[in-house]
């Protein structure tokens, strides 16, 4: 079962790995949108991601199993992405990207919930499974970002990233329907919507976790969507940007593989403090801006920043969830 969950994670992160590192360049250099429009478009997944988990937290493992819901979300997201790849005007692109965010963003919480449901020991096993998601990101960064983009002229191959993402979503949709269902006991359908999942966060420690995650997530978005134009401004060619950013994902693979042992030794809370501290250090390095070795070293700290804070946070939430509230709690935490 660990292999099947690892493959699910590989495909899940292959999907955004094809688009996120180059999306801002695609909007700016290929579609020639001004900077303020690029910013508005990139904000859409965050807005959609804020709304979608409330709905998903109610139906996941209640009206439909998490595995089936994951497949449905990816199938619809793939269709939306194909349409999106054909858009050249700002308003249609903005609207469709918001729809895509509504469909795709909840899949992060769903894959976490599915993996956490099936593993016997979340603290020991989850990091090793989640590691393969990052491996998927690294593979597409090199296969598409370096080998494919390098063979094109200028930015003419950037639109292909959207089609790669859509195709992988279709593959994952089909694969999701073959996964064993997460069986939970029946719940009272008359229960107030979201109440059981929201009650998970009523504890003071989890409230503090959500506040810290909110702040850290705001900073983290600059890495995902701002690094490609930042590296481009520093003189990196388009075909080298995704491989350069994949250094962070390679370090993430290593840290995730060691996460279980690290959490057993230092605990979740200390790990999250280290992750937040590393986040601050790397942005200081980015602000300095040179030499190249410092920038690449700062990118390499991504593994500690992400795994020690965000992945540890998912495990912490799972510790305080029941099988009935697991999927909903993961969705709400994704906000």
Predicted regions and their residues:
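Intracellular juxtamembrane helix-capping segments at the cytosolic ends
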Residues: 23, 105-120, 308-322
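C-terminal membrane-cytosol helix-exit motif in multi-pass small-molecule transporters
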Residues: 144-148, 161, 166-185
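Hydrophobic core of transmembrane alpha-helices in multi-pass small-molecule transporters
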Residues: 10, 80-84, 90-110, 114, ...
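Juxtamembrane intracellular "pre-TM" segments in multi-pass secondary transporters
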Residues: 179-212
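Helix-to-loop junctions at the C-terminal end of transmembrane segments
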Residues: 51-65, 148-152, 254-268
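Structural signature of the two symmetry-related core transmembrane helices
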Residues: 68-82, 270-285
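Conserved MFS/SLC helix-loop-helix module at the cytosolic interface between two early adjacent transmembrane helices
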Residues: 51-88
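Helix-loop boundary and gating motifs at the non-cytosolic
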Residues: 1-46, 205-246
